């Protein structure tokens, strides 16, 4: 069971009929704990018909496909979400699934982020055009003019 001190954010699907991304904040990832949290996240994702699971810790962020239960991308949160490629091979390979690619592909979709104004990646997201910080820590990409 996921403890209350971890954030789980959901929007009403009627209000936002778009892709759902689950957020879970954990203090650290050990393989055992990581697997446990992903299993729990995927259970919630299936119940909510979520497409992706996003797991955030102070050191890294991982985005998983809820349907295949396979990783899509990983970012090093300590460096403001610069692609973290040690586990995922070359930077070129990762860049296809990098934050820039994700935000450009999901023009009309919502991505959930931790509701914390002090984290360094907020400005990076704004520079990428991912602005419009909404309630519950959600940010949405600006529509193309």
Model-based region annotation:
Residues 1-52, 62-145:
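A short, conserved, highly charged catalytic patch centered on acidic carboxylates
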């Amino acid at each position: 069971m996921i403890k209350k001190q971890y954030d789980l954010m959901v929007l009403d699907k009627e209000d936002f009929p778009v892709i759902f991304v689950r957020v879970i904040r954990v203090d650290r990832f050990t393989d055992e704990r990581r697997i446990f949290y992903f299993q729990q996240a995927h259970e919630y994702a299936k119940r909510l018909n979520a497409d992706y699971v996003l797991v955030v810790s102070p050191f890294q962020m991982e985005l998983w496909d809820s349907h295949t239960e396979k990783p899509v991308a990983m970012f090093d949160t300590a460096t403001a979400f610069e692609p973290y490629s040690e586990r995922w091979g070359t930077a070129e390979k990762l860049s296809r699934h990098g934050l820039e690619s994700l935000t450009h592909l999901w023009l009309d979709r919502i991505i959930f982020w931790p509701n914390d104004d002090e984290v360094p990646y907020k400005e990076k997201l704004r520079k990428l055009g991912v602005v419009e910080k909404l309630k519950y820590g959600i940010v949405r990409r600006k529509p193309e003019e």
